[in-house]
Amino acid sequence: MEVAAKLSGARISAQKARLVADQIRGKKVGDALNLLAFSSKKAAEIMKKVLESAVANAEHNEGADVDDLKVSTVFVNEGRSLKRIMPRAKGRADRIVKRSCHITVKVADK
């Protein structure tokens, strides 16, 4: 049994979120939550919420035991980009790209 949780449009770049996703992939849920709780990255806080949602889905919908779950799949896809302008000297402007991503976490029995 595999249960998923997805967050669309998280306001962090996919590159930064993938650094955290690579750390928790394949770990037991308890170990992954512990690792995310003590990580200082912004993506860790977002990823922790998605993982907790996946665990709650498994517990509520499938009646799974939390101690037996592991993170089977984590992937991060690029979302929409917000394009903004930063005024510069002499009438010029720089483009600012505010990136977002879609985070999917799947948990499964061992």
Curated annotation (Swiss-Prot):
The entry's keywords: Ribonucleoprotein, Ribosomal protein, RNA-binding, rRNA-binding
A Pfam family of this chain: Ribosomal_L22
Family matches, as PROSITE patterns: RIBOSOMAL_L22
GO MF annotation list: rRNA binding; structural constituent of ribosome
Superkingdom of origin: Bacteria
Keyword Translocase: no
InterPro entries registered for this protein in UniProt: Ribosomal_uL22, Ribosomal_uL22_bac/chlpt-type, Ribosomal_uL22_bac/org-type, Ribosomal_uL22_CS, Ribosomal_uL22_sf
GO BP annotation list: translation
GO CC terms in record: cytosolic large ribosomal subunit
Database matches in HAMAP family: Ribosomal_uL22_B
Homology family: Belongs to the universal ribosomal protein uL22 family.
Quaternary structure, from the entry: Part of the 50S ribosomal subunit.
Functional note: This protein binds specifically to 23S rRNA; its binding is stimulated by other ribosomal proteins, e.g. L4, L17, and L20. It is important during the early stages of 50S assembly. It makes multiple contacts with different domains of the 23S rRNA in the assembled 50S subunit and ribosome. The globular domain of the protein is located near the polypeptide exit tunnel on the outside of the subunit, while an extended beta-hairpin is found that lines the wall of the exit tunnel in the center of the 70S ribosome.
The protein's name: Large ribosomal subunit protein uL22
Species this chain originates from: Stutzerimonas stutzeri (strain A1501)
Lineage of producing organism: Bacteria, Pseudomonadati, Pseudomonadota, Gammaproteobacteria, Pseudomonadales
Gene that this sequence comes from: rplV
